[in-house]
């Protein structure tokens, strides 16, 4: 695992310099009974490499109906506190707003992946605003996966109305065969909100796990 992680970080460093960009790696595990074991393995590799600055965060993804062992959350929080890693959790994509609350309270999430269910709970919207948690909105993916039906407006419109922090993201671009630019287009088709789009780059920098952007 350490060797594979080093290869990835070396490539990120090489191409960051080649194209004069800043980039970092978020280590992702999926929900399931082996989630703690997988996270320990990744964190062990991270520590064995001297806690490289190229690793900037941790992510929990996968089926929200699967509850990982309770220790998973404490491992995420511990890594956040000890190493200063950003935490993003896929939650609220399948309609359960309580998963968003759990991601924030139990895992210490700084960002929420998808989070389309947030508009169903005024309480959770208040929590999001109070703690300044950012939603990673993926317009194209949400339609393709059925997280948002073809006949319903995308929840991002209500997020804007309720002052919920969010950024536009791509999700599995190789699988969905779409780019971030196309997600921008989808967002504009949904909202026609030029003000939000004009400020999107600054919003993305604000909530990025990269230091000093």
What is each residue range found by the language model?
Residues 130, 181-183, 190-213:
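Mid-to-C-terminal alpha-helical segments outside catalytic/metal-binding sites
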Residues 1-27, 36:
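Active-site loop-helix segments enriched in His/Asp/Glu that coordinate
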Residues 139-145, 167-169, 185-190:
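Short beta-alpha connecting loops at secondary-structure transitions
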Residues 23-25, 87, 135, 166:
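Hydrophobic/aromatic residues located in beta-strands of well-ordered beta-sheets
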Residues 149-161, 175-177, 183:
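Flexible glycine/proline-rich, aromatic-decorated loop/lid segments
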Residues 35-158:
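Catalytic core of soluble alpha/beta enzymes
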Residues 88-94, 164-180:
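Short acidic/histidine-rich active-site segments
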Residues 14-21, 50-53, 82-85, 192-196:
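Short helix-capping segments at alpha-helix termini
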